[in-house]
């Protein structure tokens, strides 16, 4: 969440920055916030006055007792003050709770260099790498190319319905090879520590990284035998959730930072609001695999860390020889918790366009504040860390890109040279 002191200092300025995000979207009830803040300040001021009065009366009671005076009236006043303070504390707790809940629905503030715009049309292309291949035969899409290789949507539909996949044989081997290759790049070349995390997490964990409470409809939640008394749990939509929350409620030493973590995991998304979009193939699935990168840094390190993380994702695409472009997302297209986001889009020949394959974001202290994760700075004070996350890469979409960019006229697939050791030296995939 954003720092509430920013809202208290200049609410209008914060609202102006938030208005650059996707509109129309009521992020904050400004009038309710002002009313609660006014009541909070009044309560805190009166509480301080009452506490001072009670201290004064306590001293007076001591003097009266020493002189044998009547303390009953003073004791009655002290008792009344105690009752008033108790009621005030209860109301203050209610106000703080309502303010906290309001903040949970407010997105992060975009950095100053983020392009301002309502949607993806305002995204800024930063660079391109590689040139799309020119084919001398009719290009086939990954569904047609993958079917003889074991990409089986008929079986997955029988098992689970739409937006699932069943891979076997060469397709499954390629999928496994890609994930292992991605992990090797990030751990062996870029210094990430490989992790294996739970795929089911508690509600407060999703609140920490910002999926809840705002985006519950995008999640799959878990019922333990229909027992609704059990703690609320969800399937992860990305291992960013579990990796980032691994440092929740901790105070880290400055020399521990940056922390760099990676994991290969399935991701589960309901795709609410995506009806009719990308219904064919692997592009948009309820369950897909991804290699995730997470960094925990100091505030001074995070801007450079984002640029390096983008490079870590680019390295995978370059080693695979896949053409791509890098976009700086606009204020209207970036995610809820992000202060700045780059998307990597890979060339998909059958669609003759670039499609997202990685998203790398600097969340600054937004998630850390929700998770209560701090580090001890050079002055010995506890300060919120910055968190970053990025895909390195989405495995299914990378499989799509390899099939389509490396296809041959006879339907076989040339194996990218970098993947051959992961596939027992195979040069081609064919039925």
Curated annotation (Swiss-Prot):
Entry binding sites for ATP: 269-271, 356-359
Keywords noted in UniProt: Aminoacyl-tRNA synthetase, ATP-binding, Cytoplasm, Ligase, Nucleotide-binding, Protein biosynthesis
GO CC aspect terms: cytoplasm
Pathway this chain belongs to: Aminoacyl-tRNA biosynthesis; selenocysteinyl-tRNA(Sec) biosynthesis; L-seryl-tRNA(Sec) from L-serine and tRNA(Sec): step 1/1
GO terms classed as biological process: selenocysteine biosynthetic process; seryl-tRNA aminoacylation
Domain of life: Bacteria
GO MF annotation: an example: serine-tRNA ligase activity
Catalytic activities: tRNA(Ser) + L-serine + ATP = L-seryl-tRNA(Ser) + AMP + diphosphate + H(+); tRNA(Sec) + L-serine + ATP = L-seryl-tRNA(Sec) + AMP + diphosphate + H(+)
Residues noted as binding L-serine in the record, renumbered to the chain: 238-240, 292, 391
Annotated function: Catalyzes the attachment of serine to tRNA(Ser). Is also able to aminoacylate tRNA(Sec) with serine, to form the misacylated tRNA L-seryl-tRNA(Sec), which will be further converted into selenocysteinyl-tRNA(Sec).
NCBIfam families cross-referenced by the UniProt entry: serS
Similarity-based family: Belongs to the class-II aminoacyl-tRNA synthetase family. Type-1 seryl-tRNA synthetase subfamily.
Notes concerning its domains: Consists of two distinct domains, a catalytic core and a N-terminal extension that is involved in tRNA binding.
PANTHER family in alphabetical order: SERINE--TRNA LIGASE (PTHR43697:SF1), SERYL-TRNA SYNTHETASE (PTHR43697)
Record-given protein name: Serine--tRNA ligase
Species this protein is from: Leptothrix cholodnii (strain ATCC 51168 / LMG 8142 / SP-6)
């Amino acid at each position: 969440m954003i720092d509430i002191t920013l809202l208290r200092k200049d609410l209008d300025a914060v609202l102006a920055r938030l208005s650059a995000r996707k509109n129309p979207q009521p992020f904050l009830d400004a009038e309710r916030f002002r009313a609660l803040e006014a009541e909070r300040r009044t309560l805190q001021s009166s509480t301080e006055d009452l506490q001072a009065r009670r201290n004064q009366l306590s001293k007076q009671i001591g003097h009266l007792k020493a002189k044998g005076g009547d303390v009953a009236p003073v004791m009655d006043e002290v008792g009344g003050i105690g009752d008033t303070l108790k009621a005030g504390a209860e109301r203050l707790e209610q106000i703080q709770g309502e303010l906290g809940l309001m903040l949970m629905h407010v997105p992060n503030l975009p950095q100053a260099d983020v392009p301002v715009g309502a949607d993806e049309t305002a995204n800024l292309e930063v660079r391109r790498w590689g040139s799309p291949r020119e084919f001398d035969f009719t290009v086939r899409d990954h569904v047609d190319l993958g079917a003889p290789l074991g990409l089986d949507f008929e079986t997955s539909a029988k098992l689970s319905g739409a937006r699932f996949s069943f891979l076997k044989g060469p397709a499954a081997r390629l999928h496994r090879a890609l994930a292992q290759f991605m992990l090797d790049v990030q751990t062996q070349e870029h210094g990430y520590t490989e992790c294996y995390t739970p795929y089911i997490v508690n509600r407060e964990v999703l609140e920490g990284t910002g999926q809840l409470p705002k985006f519950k409809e995008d999640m799959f939640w878990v019922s333990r035998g229909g027992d609704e008394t059990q703690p609320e749990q969800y399937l992860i939509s990305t291992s960013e959730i579990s990796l980032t929350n691994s440092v929740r409620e901790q105070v880290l030493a400055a020399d521990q930072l940056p922390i760099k973590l990676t994991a290969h995991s399935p991701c589960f998304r309901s795709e609410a609001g995506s009806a009719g979009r990308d219904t064919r193939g692997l592009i948009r699935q309820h369950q897909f695999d991804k290699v995730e990168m997470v960094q925990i840094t100091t505030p001074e390190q995070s801007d450079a860390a984002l640029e390096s993380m983008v490079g870590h994702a680019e390295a995978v695409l370059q080693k695979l020889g896949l053409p791509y472009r890098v976009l700086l997302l606009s204020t209207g297209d970036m995610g809820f918790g992000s202060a700045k986001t780059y998307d990597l889009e890979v060339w998909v020949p059958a669609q003759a366009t670039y499609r997202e394959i990685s998203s790398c974001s600097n969340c600054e202290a937004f998630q850390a504040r929700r998770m209560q994760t701090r580090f001890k700075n050079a002055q010995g004070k506890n300060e919120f860390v910055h968190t970053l996350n990025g895909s390195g890469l989405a495995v299914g979409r990378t499989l799509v890109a390899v099939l389509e960019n490396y296809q041959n006229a006879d339907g076989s697939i040339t194996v990218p040279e970098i993947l051959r050791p992961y596939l027992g030296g195979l040069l081609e995939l064919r039925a």
